[in-house]
Amino acid sequence: MGAVHTRFVVGESRTNADNAITKTYGTFYMAFEVDDETLEVVDFSCTHTIDTTQSFLRKVFLGERFPDIDNWLEQKLSERYGGSSRKAVLVAYRDALKRWRFMMED
């Protein structure tokens, strides 16, 4: 197996009790693959019940510098994301960012 130059990190959060994601999965997860050199998000997925949710969020995150997303994510979600899991997306990203920073310290 060749050298891997990315890191995989998952963020977790809760959604509303009546949200379909909560009813189906119990919690909301977002997974990021981040390039070690450029710090760009090269792959993304999340728990979802509607495929368009993951498709939309992929467009938000792919190609962006992972640590810089925190500077604009809340505003972008407020303007462009009308899903009931908006707060969960922000919390899951910040959880993933915290885990990623911990991994980068090693």
Question: What function would you assign to each model-found segment?
Answer:
Residues 1-12:
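Short, compositionally biased leader-like segments
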